Amino acid sequence: MKITRIAVGVLLLTGLVLGIRGMRADSKAPAVGTPAPEFTLNSQEAKPVSLHDYKGKWVVLYFYPKDFTSGCTVEAHNFQRDLAQYEQKGAVILGVSVQDEDSHQKFCTKEGLNFKLLADTKTEVSTLYDSVMNFGVAKLSARHTFVIDPNGVVRKVFLDVKPQPHSEEVLAALTELQAAAGK
């Protein structure tokens, strides 16, 4: 009986993982060269932040599943580690997940994060960017990243993100994009 439950659990988990991977393959995320969907969400300070607030700057818009989880913490730490390099390139980092402002504030305080985390509690922005993992009653933001140019156009999309090397990958892409744009 216990073996049957374990086998069923493994099969369900396998189906979930394959289903998420399948979503990525058929992604309807904003494509490179298209305008980034506009949004307004509250930050960890409970203040509204809109994409258009950053017109004229490069934006690294990264979606992540959940505050205080291992992969999300590693990813956030690495963005924080590299924050000065992003700022030198005229870029801002905006993190988005489904947790509320209070959770984001606690996460930023505990982990020493000095960039904005946005509360997408209704998954509206995650949906706009095709970055939602749906688990029936629960939804989380999928680990996707969009690099948006100063004119609000998507220039790079990362759909299969690994937390550890991700900030370095984004920095390399940003450097390449800026060189191509003559910056």
Residue ranges and their predicted role:
Residues M1-N42, K183:
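N-terminal targeting signals for export/organelle localization
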Residues P30, F39-V59:
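A short beta-strand-turn-helix
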Residues A36-P37, W58, A142-H144:
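Short loop/turn microsegments at loop-to-beta-strand junctions
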Residues H52-T73:
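Short active-site neighborhood of thiol/selenol oxidoreductases, capturing the structured segment around
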Residues G71-L113, T121-T127:
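Structural microenvironment flanking redox-active thiols in thiol-disulfide oxidoreductases
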Residues L113-F115, V132-F135, K139-F146:
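Structural micro-motif
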Residues L140-K183:
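Thiol-/selenol-based redox modules, centered on thioredoxin-like
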